Swiss-Prot record:
UniProt GO cellular component terms: mitochondrial inner membrane; mitochondrial large ribosomal subunit; mitochondrion
Function of the molecule: Component of the mitochondrial ribosome (mitoribosome), a dedicated translation machinery responsible for the synthesis of mitochondrial genome-encoded proteins, including at least some of the essential transmembrane subunits of the mitochondrial respiratory chain. The mitoribosomes are attached to the mitochondrial inner membrane and translation products are cotranslationally integrated into the membrane.
GO BP field: mitochondrial translation
Signal peptide positions on this chain: none
Name of the protein in question: Large ribosomal subunit protein uL23m
Name of the gene encoding the protein in the UniProt record: MRP20
GO molecular function: structural constituent of ribosome
InterPro entries for this protein: Nucleotide-bd_a/b_plait_sf, Ribosomal_uL23-like, Ribosomal_uL23/eL15/eS24_sf
Length: 263
């Protein structure tokens, strides 16, 4: 098939535009010139500029509304119409990460919660003003109970970070020597021991444990005396024959007692 030159492609382009019209009247669509492109882009710029002005006006309106509500000691947002007297939502306050400032707080919220719900909840229950809220939805992690079962996904976790008016600094954690209940060494070792015992299958059955510094086992196998293979087989056969003879003798004794009881 011969290759199309630039002039041939320009000649075929209006024909392709005509076929693309469909079942309507075949009407040739002219190719746009460079001037029309520049003109349309200038219109888009003008339109985006007007939209930006509208956004600025809305943001200024929200800012003034929020400022007036804070100065008057009222809500800095529009309160919802549905009244909830006994909220069942569980809100968990988390410790801040290294990227968080003292003016930020992070919560775990239900997946049905949105930003407006958290803002309303914190203000009416704790009197805390949430100025800006960001949402983060963590994917469910894969987990399994043990190696025999199939893996499954844990539920997703939804977190929200708010910005506050005043800073809040978490108190320092007490040292284990100050508060024995704050020492998590024993629970962590118990969890590690449980995981090791559940996963000790096959070649890992005799693997030494690491929980509690290996005191509770499983222990490493000690050196065993060398026994030749043929001698080990001979000893095992004698042991099995002796066990079979004892089992046969027990059955004969039981049968003899049963016959004596009948007479």
């Amino acid at each position: 098939m011969p290759r199309l030159t630039v002039g041939t492609k320009n000649m075929l382009y209006p024909l392709q535009k005509t076929l693309a019209v469909g079942s309507c009247k075949p009407e040739q669509v002219p190719i746009r010139s460079l001037a029309s492109v520049v003109e349309s882009s200038s219109k888009i710029l003008d339109k985006s500029g007007s939209d930006r002005e509208v956004d600025i006006n809305v943001s200024e309106k929200i800012y003034k509304w929020t400022k007036a509500g804070i100065e008057q000691g009222k809500e800095h947002f529009k309160v919802g119409g549905n009244k909830v007297y006994f909220p069942k939502a569980r809100i968990i306050l988390l410790r801040p990460n290294a990227k968080h400032t003292p003016y930020q707080a992070k919560f775990i919220v239900p997946k049905s919660f949105n930003k407006l719900d958290l803002r309303d909840y914190l203000y009416h229950i704790y009197g805390l003003r949430a100025m800006n809220i960001t949402t983060q939805l963590l994917h469910g992690k894969f987990n399994r109970m043990n190696l025999q079962t199939t893996r499954f996904r844990e539920p997703q976790i939804k977190k929200m970070t708010i910005e506050m008016e005043e800073p809040f600094i978490w108190p320092e954690e007490p040292r284990p020597d100050e508060n024995s209940f704050w020492d998590s060494t024993t629970p962590d070792n118990m969890e590690k021991y449980r995981e090791e015992r559940l996963n000790c299958l096959g070649s890992d059955a005799n693997k030494p444990g690491t929980a509690f510094d290996g005191v509770v086992g499983p222990y490493e196998r000690v050196a065993q005396p060398f026994i030749p293979r043929f001698l080990k087989r001979e000893i095992d056969n004698k042991r099995e024959r002796h066990a079979a003879e004892l089992q046969r003798a027990d059955k004969l004794i039981a049968l003899n007692r049963y016959i004596e009881d009948l007479h």
